[in-house]
């Protein structure tokens, strides 16, 4: 588990800390577990929930089954490890696995655990009862009774069938990023699969590890759980194929292993060490043989697997030169691209020798300077790859040119949706070398806005796809773990005429929708793109992020805890530019909303666009508002109520929208960013601050 570290405590907004435990968890966690944490009775938990005014929130087991990350995040700063494990009803081993393996969860939480004292129930004083009664009145006033149930997703079905059979690969919207196939073969519903098929999708990609699907010799623990995963995965592949959907495994190999887990007889294979994880250096013949045998075992035992997408430079420790800074002496004479090609070619040979038709697609993510690739080395890598290995580039990830100005886009983006200079060069080169080529893009959303299933910037998406087609790219991976919703936007990948697509989806209202979407694109062009802003600001939490009167001195964490760390959100020299661009962006978004809301008798599809554009606008407005609040709160003479009043308005608007649609606030790797409880706590937070500023 992550190291427990002493940091400044965060303010709470209930009279007693144990009340915050109830406020954040009532309805998400069984009352007997809350009672066990607080050392009181379940009856007492119910009484105190009623005293707070939240007794109408009903417990739903699905929170623990499908959104345990939400519960972890809600209590990360509130409870110590012992009480957190009790609340989750989770073993230390299971929590450690999730922190280490569930899409960088440990990093997102800050890579450490804030120390916390034990929190136990204590009888309230008369003054605390009085304060609690005031909170009850507030929450009764704003409580929404029919808040939508989590995971009650309704999927769009279109007639956007992909008749040309080019690859349209996506990550399943509802699929968690953990150890899915240990639990079930029915990881995705019939309705979701049917919706993908109807929107032109013919492939699903799923993250996996060879060690979880094949015999793994290097661990002290030898178990056979991989057999169960394999069985479930085979059943799932057959299930998906019944809807015309192929399955691709996304592999980042050979994975490092925890130092404590490594069998000592393999110590000689150790390479680069990062924290508690050690690479098994792929320059060793033993590791190459393992990679060969495991890949061969995989495709022989999962015969209907359509493809493997490899990533050979990434945040995960795989080969010793996956990122700069290796001190391994075994592979010191290798360049990163040589190790990447060694991995890809070894896996391809295993597939070929197995007589399998499983494809290998080499993702070029990280074949770039930030992973220590020198100019020209990505092309050298393509030269080294077997000609039957397919090449995929993250289209927008790299250098862009506007006029005489060059700038970098270092994340998935819909605001800068076009192939970058490096993508154009590499895909053209790979095509000349007779490799099949694919483009990786985002169609639905990105970290610019991840908490709605799609953002309505269809014009940007269509233009991006058009530019890729002009390069000869007709096969696409259409999402990362975010952006997998089966929306009508997916069928853009199989449409060559934007107006026809609009007419098909919006009928007589398509011209008004086109005008509104153009306004969205104009506004989005102002977006002050910066990876720190995407990862560390509240763009993807919006008004659910709590405010604090005093500076917390907490550092923002990746897409999880923005806190009040404004200097990490936006650098000081970019302050005015950020404010001006966000104001312009919001102005255009509101103009787009005005156009859409003027449509008479709008269809459900248009109402959905209005809803998601509203959420998007609210979150951006709140980010700007929180930024100004936190900048100004250090000056005691500043009137902060102007920001608090606006934040309350935005909070109530988002709360209302989220109560109507279970997709709002959900994203596969982070699960639910907010719940009804989150909004109720934020309302108390703002009203108490208003009284004290």
What role is predicted for each listed range?
Residues 40, 90, 201, 243-245, ...:
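Short glycine/serine/threonine/alanine-rich loop segments
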Residues 324-334:
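A solvent-exposed, charged loop/short amphipathic helix patch at secondary-structure junctions
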């Amino acid at each position: 588990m992550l190291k427990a570290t002493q940091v400044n405590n965060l303010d709470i907004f209930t009279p007693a800390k144990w009340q915050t435990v109830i406020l954040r968890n009532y309805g998400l966690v069984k009352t007997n577990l809350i009672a066990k944490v607080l050392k009181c009775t379940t009856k007492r938990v119910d009484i105190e929930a009623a005293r707070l005014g939240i007794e109408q929130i009903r417990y739903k087991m699905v929170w623990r089954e499908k959104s345990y990350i939400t519960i972890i995040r809600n209590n990360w700063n509130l409870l110590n490890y012992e009480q957190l494990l009790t609340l989750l009803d989770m073993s230390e081993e299971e929590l450690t696995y999730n922190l280490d393996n569930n899409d960088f969860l440990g990093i997102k939480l800050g890579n450490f655990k804030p120390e916390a004292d034990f929190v136990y129930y204590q009888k309230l004083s008369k003054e605390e009862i009085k304060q609690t009664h005031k909170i009850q009145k507030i929450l009764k006033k704003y409580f929404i009774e029919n808040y939508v149930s989590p995971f009650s997703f309704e999927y769009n079905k279109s007639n956007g069938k992909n008749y040309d059979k080019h690859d349209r690969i996506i990550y399943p919207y509802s699929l968690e990023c953990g150890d899915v196939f240990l639990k079930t073969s029915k990881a995705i519903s019939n309705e979701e699969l049917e919706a993908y098929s109807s929107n032109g999708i013919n492939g699903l990609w799923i993250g996996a590890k060879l060690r979880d699907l094949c015999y793994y010799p290097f661990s002290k623990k030898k178990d056979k759980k991989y057999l169960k995963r394999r069985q479930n995965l085979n059943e799932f592949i057959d299930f998906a194929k019944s809807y015309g959907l192929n399955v691709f495994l996304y592999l980042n190999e050979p994975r490092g292993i925890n130092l404590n887990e490594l069998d000592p007889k393999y110590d000689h294979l150790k390479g680069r060490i990062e924290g508690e994880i050690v690479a098994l250096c792929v320059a060793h013949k033993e590791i190459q043989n393992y990679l060969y045998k495991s890949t061969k075992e995989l495709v022989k035992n999962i015969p209907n697997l359509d493809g493997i997408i490899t990533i050979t430079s990434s945040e995960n420790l795989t080969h010793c030169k996956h990122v700069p800074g290796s001190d391994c002496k075994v592979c010191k004479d290798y360049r990163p691209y040589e190790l990447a090609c060694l991995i890809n070619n070894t896996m391809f040979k295993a597939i070929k020798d197995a007589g399998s038709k499983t494809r290998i697609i080499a993702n070029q993510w990280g074949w770039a300077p930030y992973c220590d690739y020198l100019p020209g080395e990505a092309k050298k890598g393509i030269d080294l790859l077997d000609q039957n290995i397919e090449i995929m580039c993250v289209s927008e990830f790299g250098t862009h040119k506007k006029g005489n100005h060059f700038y970098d886009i270092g994340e998935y983006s819909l605001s800068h949706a076009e192939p970058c200079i490096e993508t154009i060069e590499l895909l053209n080169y790979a095509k000349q070398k007779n490799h099949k080529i694919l483009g990786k893009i985002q169609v639905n959303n990105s970290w610019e806005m991840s908490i709605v299933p799609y953002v309505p910037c269809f014009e940007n998406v269509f233009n991006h796809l058009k530019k890729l087609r002009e390069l000869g790219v007709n096969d696409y991976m259409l999402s990362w773990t975010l952006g997998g919703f089966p929306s009508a936007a997916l069928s853009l990948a199989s449409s060559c005429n934007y107006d026809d697509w609009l007419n098909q989806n919006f009928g007589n209202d398509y011209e008004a929708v086109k005008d509104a979407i153009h306004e969205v694109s104009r506004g989005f062009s102002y977006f002050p793109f910066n990876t720190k802003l995407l990862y560390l600001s509240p763009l993807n939490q919006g008004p659910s992020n709590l405010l604090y009167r005093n500076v917390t001195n907490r550092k923002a964490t990746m897409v999880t805890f923005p806190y009040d760390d404004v200097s990490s959100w936006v650098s000081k020299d970019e302050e005015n530019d950020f404010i001006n661009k966000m104001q312009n962006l919001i102005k255009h978004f509101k103009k787009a909303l005005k156009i859409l809301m003027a449509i008479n008798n709008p269809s459900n599809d248009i109402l959905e666009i209005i809803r998601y554009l509203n959420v998007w606008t609210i979150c951006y407005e709140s980010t700007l508002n929180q930024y100004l609040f936190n900048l100004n709160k250090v000056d005691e003479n500043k009137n902060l109520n102007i920001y608090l009043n606006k934040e309350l308005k935005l909070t109530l608007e988002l709360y209302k929208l989220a109560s109507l649609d279970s997709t709002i606030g959900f994203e596969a790797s982070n699960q639910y960013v907010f719940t009804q409880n989150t909004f109720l706590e934020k309302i108390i937070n703002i009203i108490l601050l208003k009284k004290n500023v």
